[in-house]
Amino acid sequence: MIGLKKVILTFFVCLIGVGGMENVWAGDKTVRDFHEFELWHKLLQYGLSPSGEWAMWRIQAGETTDTLFVRNIVSGKEYKYKETSAPEFSKDSRWIVFSEPTGEDVAAGIAYQVKLVCLADGEEQIFRGIESFTFTSDSKCLILKGKNAGDAVELNLYDLEKKRIKNIANIQEYTVDPTGKYLAYTLKAEKGLSNSLEVLELNDYRLLFLENDKNGYEKLKWTDHGLLFMKVLSDSTGQKQGRE
């Protein structure tokens, strides 16, 4: 049964992919040139939203240009975006997020931005200076990781419902719990000092837990029983000796 579902899904996505090619071909030719069918093989990516309501696929129509199609399977409502990468649906199928070029000339190469789209009305939000992104499992928050600055990063937490953002700088390590409600992270301290461990409630950005230790923390991991982490041990001289 699982194998049959995969075949049906693949066939369905290929059908809507071919339908999307109508915008690639110019004009309304009755007879197609044979070389045009090569475009059918350039399906870069496809998938369904968790609810099965939306389908998305990326088709490359030229040597460098590709288009992301996002279509509602029932209503036929469709969005199109050029030259995107890493599209991701939220778990509740209400949002899609992806990376795209900013369109600006940058000496070091192509500059990218992150675009968040509300599938209900097409409303967009743009975020700059982001290296990676993901939705929390409860679809309440979009976590945007900034570019590395030394051995620390900057996190931007975007509340999807309230449309507000919280910035946390100097993060060394972070992890979100399986429910998507809590964020645990360690903060880089000033030179010569240890880091600190904090736990934030993502719903209202309330700090639930704060711990400081002269030795510091690392290797954070959420489990079904709570947060696990390692505490660095040091001797009387301050030299690191191990972990517990």
Where are these regions (language model features)?
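Bacterial N-terminal signal peptides
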Residues: 10-20
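Beta-strand-rich domains and repeat architectures in extracellular enzymes and scaffolds
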Residues: 34-68
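Short loop/turn segments that connect beta-strands within beta-propeller blades
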Residues: 72-76, 118-122, 158-163, 201-205
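Blade-loop segments of beta-propeller domains
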Residues: 74-103, 111-112, 121-132, 214
